[in-house]
UniProtKB/Swiss-Prot annotation:
PANTHER family: ARABINANASE_LEVANSUCRASE_INVERTASE (PTHR35279:SF1), PTHR35279. This is Uncharacterized protein Rv1502. SUPFAM superfamilies: Arabinanase/levansucrase/invertase (SSF75005). It comes from the Bacteria.
Length: 299
């Protein structure tokens, strides 16, 4: 099966103070009919990430209907765990409550950063507010270095999270051994980690696996994630329980374009179904510097 690219949907114009560059980590939220809000992370003039959104019409290839001027979430107060930026991981809806999970960026001295995971909550359509000034998934003996992009789903009465974790630090930011791990929660804010690694590509040509996206398909869990050696590509895996994964390698149905906005790398996949079709949002060159686009799965 192949993904047919529908083209780039959005790239920042540089006019908004919180979105001077980049549109990374797109996450869809259905509004009504064929209308979706696509959340993404943009960067300001100081390279700090905020979480914003665009409104699109999927019936016409993701045509943009609106670009809200204000972001959903800005970096935290000075000294907080997310004061250097916030990057979206996922959104979970539980009745009238929405939980937005994100990576909180915190730059360091001896290493580039020591990131953790936070959550912001919206009740009955109100603006998102941080649940706490502290992370909900923090560094500890299991994850001593840095965390990244959480993906959360509700599975029965359990919240399940797959997230990225550094195994250490390389000589540069392109040489970071990074794996995907797992935690679970009863309420979505208090999390219990497992003592194992679930996706590890560090023994291959790829030093880092990150930004997991998980769906449950007819009793089978499917994960898309991005991994990189020199450049990011999109990979996939399957599991019967969401814990033990069979890594299938690169998703051969989608790759970089010969000469376009996504000719150097494709990353941060987010897969969703609508009106009997399966779509993929993904970011392009430069970790989303050129924006994000849309593809549809063809049998």
């Amino acid at each position: 099966m192949a993904w047919r690219k529908l083209g780039r949907i959005f790239a920042p114009s540089g006019e908004l103070d919180w979105s001077r560059s980049h549109a990374a980590l797109p996450v869809p939220e259905w509004i009504e009919g064929d209308i979706f809000r696509i959340y993404f992370s943009g960067r300001d003039g100081q390279n700090r990430s905020s979480i914003g959104s665009v409104i699109v019409d999927l019936a016409v290839g993701g045509k943009i209907l609106d670009i809200p001027a204000e972001p959903i979430l800005r970096p935290g107060a000075r000294g907080m765990f997310d004061d250097c930026g916030v990057s979206i991981g996922s959104i979970v809806r539980a009745g009238d409550t929405r939980l937005l999970y994100y990576t909180g960026w915190n730059l360091a001295v001896t290493v580039p950063w020591k990131n953790t995971i936070g959550v912001a909550i919206s009740e009955a359509g109100a603006p998102f507010e941080r649940w706490s000034t502290f992370p909900v998934v923090a560094l500890d003996e299991r994850d001593p270095f840095s965390l990244s992009y959480p993906w959360v789903i509700q599975d029965g009465g359990t919240y399940r999270m797959w997230y990225g974790s550094n195994l250490g630090w390389g000589e540069g930011t392109d040489e970071i051994p990074h794996v995907i791990r797992y935690a679970q929660s009863r309420d979505g804010v208090h999390w219990e980690k497992q003592d194992r690694v679930h996706i590890d590509t560090s023994g291959s040509d790829n030093s880092a696996a990150c930004r997991p996206y998980v769906v449950r398909d007819a009793g089978v869990y499917r994960m898309w994630f991005c991994a990189r050696g020199a450049k990011y590509r999109i990979y996939c895996a399957t599991s019967e329980d969401g814990l033990t994964w069979r890594q299938l390698g690169k998703d051969e149905g989608i790759d970089v374009s010969p000469d376009s906005w996504d000719s150097d790398m494709i990353e941060y996949p987010c897969v969703f179904d609508h009106r009997g079709q399966r779509f993929m949002l993904y970011s392009g060159d430069g970790y989303g510097r050129t924006g994000f686009g849309l593809a549809v799965l063809e049998n």
